C-alpha cells in the first residue's frame, strides 16, 4: 500500500490507542472517541496517511458510540474485507491508501445508501473547512 510509514515511525507518531486501532484491528471503547460529537464542516482523513475518507455532510448520529457516516468520499477511499472474528460476520473497512484499520460497515444506515460506516475516532483526523484546523482522533 502507498504512503504507509514504517512500523517504527507509526509507533513513535501515534498514541497507544491509535496504534492499536489502526495497526492491530482494534476498537476503541464506545462513546470515548474525540471525534464522535464533532459537528464542524470539513473532511475526515486517515490518521496514518492523511488520505481523505469521509465528508462531514455524510456524518450522522447513529447512537452506536462511534462516528458514523453513510458514504465515503470515493469508491477508492475504502478497502473492504470479510471479518469473521469474535463469532460475528462483518465487513471490515480499511484505508484504501495505506490499509489502516478504520472500523466496519453495516447495512443499517440511513438513505441514500442504507449503509453505516462505523469508524473509530482513533483512526481519523479531521480538517475544519472554515479555518483549516486539524483535530486528531
From Swiss-Prot:
GO biological processes: protein repair; response to oxidative stress
Keywords assigned: Metal-binding, Oxidoreductase, Zinc
EC nos: 1.8.4.12
Cofactor note: Binds 1 zinc ion per subunit. The zinc ion is important for the structural integrity of the protein.
Cofactor(s) required, per the database record: Zn(2+)
Active site per UniProt: 118
GO molecular function term, any single one: peptide-methionine (R)-S-oxide reductase activity
GO cellular component: cytoplasm
Reactions listed under catalytic activity: L-methionyl-[protein] + [thioredoxin]-disulfide + H2O = L-methionyl-(R)-S-oxide-[protein] + [thioredoxin]-dithiol
Name of this chain's protein: Peptide methionine sulfoxide reductase MsrB
Lineage summary: Bacteria, Pseudomonadati, Pseudomonadota, Gammaproteobacteria, Enterobacterales
Amino acid at each position: 500500500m502507498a504512503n504507509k510509514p514504517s512500523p517504527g515511525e507509526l509507533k513513535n507518531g501515534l498514541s497507544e490507542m491509535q496504534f492499536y486501532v489502526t495497526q492491530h484491528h482494534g476498537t476503541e471503547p464506545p462513546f470515548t472517541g474525540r471525534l464522535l460529537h464533532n459537528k464542524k464542516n470539513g473532511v475526515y482523513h486517515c490518521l496514518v496517511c492523511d488520505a481523505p475518507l469521509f465528508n462531514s455532510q455524510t456524518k450522522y448520529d447513529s447512537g452506536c458510540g462511534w462516528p458514523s457516516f453513510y458514504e465515503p468520499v470515493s469508491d477508492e477511499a475504502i478497502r473492504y474485507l470479510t471479518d469473521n472474528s469474535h463469532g460475528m460476520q462483518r465487513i471490515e473497512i480499511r484505508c484504501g491508501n495505506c490499509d489502516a484499520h478504520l472500523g466496519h460497515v453495516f447495512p443499517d444506515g440511513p438513505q441514500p445508501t442504507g449503509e453505516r460506516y462505523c469508524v473509530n475516532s482513533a483512526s481519523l483526523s479531521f480538517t475544519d473547512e472554515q479555518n483549516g484546523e486539524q483535530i486528531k482522533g
